[in-house]
Amino acid sequence: MAVSLWQQCIGRLQDELSAQQFSMWIRPLQAEMDGDTLVLYAPNRFVLDWVRDKYINIINQFFTEQMGNDAPKLRFDIGSRPSAKKPEPAPVAAVRVPNPQTKASVGTSFNTTEPVANANHRSNINPTYQFDNFVEGKSNQLGKAAALQVAENPGGAYNPLFLYGGTGLGKTHLLHAVGNGIIKNNPDAKVVYMHSERFVQDMVKALQNNAIEEFKRYYRSVDALFIDDIQFFANKDRSQEEFFHTFNALLEGNHQIILTSDRYPKEIDGVEDRLKSRFGWGLTVAIEPPELETRVAILMRKAQESGINLPDEVAFFIAKRLRSNVRELEGALNRVIANANFTGRPITIDFVREALRDLLALQEKLVTIDNIQKTVAEYYKIKMADMLSKRRSRSVARPRQVAMALSKELTNQSLPEIGDAFGGRDHTTVLHACRKIAQLREESHDIKEDYANLIRTLSS
């Protein structure tokens, strides 16, 4: 009875949570009765703590609504429920000790000059990129959580893991952190990280050297394959064909795949639909530009690593003006530190204004959300107040969605920051608006023309 109630509760949670949250935190749970107590089994401590902290009230409330005083007690545990049938052992484990004939290590690419059985993987997982030095915030929290679980259980629930977002937001850092985590747990694991262009280059070399079979065996024998910037596969038909079969072979063997891109999988032009579909089989997570608090934390961490005492007010000054990505922040701080070391002057706000004069001047010329809202309101002849209101009529909602999409494209603000600027809306509302307008620009000539006109107005 209580287990059946849990199935109903799952339905409620699926309605209330985003698809991403449900897939990451609720789907992995297993339920079983132990006397008058319903035990929820989580795959690891991280999921257990998260569900207990974030969702316990929703679960208990649902049980009380359905059964009143007869609602079961709730307990959490780690592992699989005792009655769960033991799975048949996979032909190849998620992280396995390789064949003695093949030296296992961390690899970068296929070598066409050696027989595949003797191919030696050169280490290219950067040991400096760890979970411990990845600064976490709302913008990347889900991405880090998913990466941690993959490192702990490669080939498990989130396979493939697809991370997408703009340049310099930490996607590559997470790839290396997962690789380091897997190797720490199993030093013999064969982990391959590469840029998508390297995969293409390796395939071309294999074709030139009549070594395509060795190429296939190499890539299909790894324990974990991480490919950065998958969007560069666009319009490379033969590479997509080979990757399609490699992808299928690795997933069938429960080997972990992580992919990154600068855009949502279905928005990658020039990539076959069958690949886009497979990219979404596991878990897809957006990595957004960091919010103010995270930008400050990144600056303080970087300064600490450099042995510099960065005043709080200086960190906030820089973080409020540079919003686009982590690399830009770190580059600006490096320039400040270099100038301070060269001149011997203390790091103050006035000193930072001088050291970053050209960079700050460029930022001040950028389009703001306020300008976008006013321009769109004037264009569609609606009130500025409507842009922030809760009104849902199409005459107001569509311009609001256009303004949100323009804000994402033309500013450095994160989705949560854009949502706040539109009357405190949730970041998922902004994401929906961006996807809706992208779709309408393909389907509606009027929306496409409106959007282009607004871009020209705002950029002039």
Swiss-Prot record:
Q: Where is this region: Domain I, interacts with DnaA modulators?
A: 1-84
Domain III, AAA+ region: annotated segments: 124-340
Q: Which Gene3D superfamilies match?
A: 1.10.1750.10, 1.10.8.60, 3.30.300.180, P-loop containing nucleotide triphosphate hydrolases
Q: What's any GO biological process attached to this entry?
A: DNA replication initiation
Matches recorded under SUPFAM superfamilies: P-loop containing nucleoside triphosphate hydrolases (SSF52540), TrpR-like (SSF48295)
Enumerate the CDD domains for this protein. AAA, Bac_DnaA_C
Domain of life of the organism in this record? Answer: Bacteria
Tell me the NCBIfam families matching this sequence: DnaA (TIGR00362)
Report what the protein is called: Chromosomal replication initiator protein DnaA
Tell me the organism.
Answer: Shewanella sp. (strain ANA-3)
